[in-house]
């Protein structure tokens, strides 16, 4: 696919979980009530998942798609070191997906992911309270034509 996109591994999950962006950590723990490492390992085993590298070899994040088109992504601060490379590779990953519909929800406070989702061509559908803390989440989707 790309020299920066690789099949996800448990080792990559450990590296991402240990250096998540603060907003991603907060979304997983406060928004979903999950442990980030556990969520990433589940993602490795239960979805078609990858990890993203940037030119200096750092892992910038992991992403995957579950059956039914539920897409997810968690990132590290390495996305800020090579923002154009990361955004281009994320777009390459999303554009290569064959699902007719990609969808999920995002914590309204996670401005970095909302900006990235917009860049990747996702549309925002509705806002609603979600999770153990009833935080504001936004449903998003992308329909392939």
Regions found by a protein language model. Give the residues of each.
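Conserved beta-strand-loop-alpha-helix junction that forms the acyl-donor binding cleft
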Residues: 103-118, 123, 129-133
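Conserved beta-hairpin
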Residues: 46-61
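A short, internal acetyl-CoA/4′-phosphopantetheine-binding micro-motif in the GNAT/acyltransferase core
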Residues: 72-88
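Active-site rim helix/loop that mediates acceptor-substrate recognition in acyltransferases
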Residues: 28-47
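Short amphipathic alpha-helix that is part of the acyltransferase structural core
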Residues: 1-34
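Conserved acyl-CoA
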Residues: 88-102, 111, 120
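A conserved beta-strand-loop-helix scaffold within acyl/acetyltransferase catalytic domains
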Residues: 63-69
């Amino acid at each position: 696919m790309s020299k920066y996109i690789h099949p996800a591994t448990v080792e990559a999950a450990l590296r991402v979980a240990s250096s998540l962006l603060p907003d991603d950590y907060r979304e997983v723990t406060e928004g979903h009530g999950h442990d980030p490492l556990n969520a990433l390992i589940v993602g490795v085993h239960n979805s078609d998942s990858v990890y993203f590298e940037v030119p200096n070899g750092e892992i910038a994040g992991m992403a995957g798609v579950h059956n039914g088109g539920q897409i997810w992504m968690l990132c590290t601060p390495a996305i800020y070191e090579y923002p154009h490379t990361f955004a281009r590779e994320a777009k390459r990953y999303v554009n290569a997906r064959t699902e007719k519909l990609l969808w999920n929800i995002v914590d309204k406070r996670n401005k970095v992911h909302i900006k990235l989702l917009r860049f990747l061509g996702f549309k925002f559908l509705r806002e609603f309270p979600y999770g153990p803390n009833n935080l504001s989440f936004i449903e998003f989707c992308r329909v392939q034509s």
